[in-house]
């Protein structure tokens, strides 16, 4: 028998709200999107036509968020084109994640995030643009999941003259492949970025001493000595 035909002429959202909580973290991560307004186009399981999406709201009452694009609602892997943007999100709210994965609390900072995800027949092409403004790390947190990298040094080196960190994280892959997962790719890219940033000063020093091929990613010296 054929599945039940479903057709919704459209959805309108007026002054709505959505809550998100991740209780796998200690402390838990909890946030809310308020003042949700917008609309979603025709939803039908009999038509392969994409439904339009245009929604806007505010994270924790003040940080604007928008979701725009289109998707096939009953088979999003067939076709999806969604752009999401977050502006001026307070970074301290992300401390549960920074504590677990970076090993530090966040003292202050703002996040601007632009995500553009496109899917055609299961093939993902994603662009993730992250801008961190005036990020300051707080006290160290003991976490078995934290990266074993000089995070404070990397943050300092990645900042430009205005104290801004800009990162682009493209992701591509086949979502029909059970071995493919987006987040491990994102975390590995971030890890590589931190490693390169932390090694940059030593490579710069190597260039000053004649551009030799000597590996200066670590520089040994005697305890108490002022000579390298």
Regions found by a protein language model. Name each.
Residues 1-93, 171-175, 183-187:
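Elongated, acidic membrane-bridging lipid-handling scaffolds
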Residues 4, 72-74, 78, 84-85, ...:
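Extended terminal
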Residues 20, 97, 220-223:
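Broad hydrophobic/π-residue packing in well-ordered secondary structure
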Residues 25-39, 58-68, 89-124, 148-149, ...:
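Amphipathic hydrophobic-ligand
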């Amino acid at each position: 028998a054929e599945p039940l035909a479903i057709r919704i002429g459209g959805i309108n959202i007026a002054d709505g709200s959505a809550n998100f909580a991740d209780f796998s973290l200690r402390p838990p991560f909890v946030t809310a999107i308020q003042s949700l307004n917008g609309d979603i186009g025709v939803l039908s399981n009999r038509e392969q036509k994409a439904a339009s999406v245009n929604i806007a709201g505010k994270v924790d009452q003040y940080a604007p968020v928008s979701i725009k694009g289109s998707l096939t609602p009953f088979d999003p892997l067939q076709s999806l084109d969604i752009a999401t943007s977050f502006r001026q999100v307070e970074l301290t709210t992300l401390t549960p994640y920074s504590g677990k994965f970076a090993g530090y609390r966040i003292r202050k900072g703002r996040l601007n995030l632009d995500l553009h995800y496109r899917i055609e027949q299961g093939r993902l092409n994603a662009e993730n643009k992250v801008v961190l403004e005036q990020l300051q790390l707080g006290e160290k947190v003991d976490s078995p999941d934290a990266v074993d990298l000089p995070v404070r040094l990397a943050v300092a080196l990645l900042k430009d003259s205005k104290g801004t960190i800009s990162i682009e994280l493209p992701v591509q892959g086949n979502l029909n492949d059970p071995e493919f997962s987006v987040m491990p790719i994102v975390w590995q890219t971030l890890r590589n970025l931190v490693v390169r940033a932390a090694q940059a000063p030593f490579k710069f020093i190597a260039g000053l001493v004649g551009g030799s091929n000597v590996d200066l990613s670590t520089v040994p010296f005697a305890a108490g000595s002022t000579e390298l």
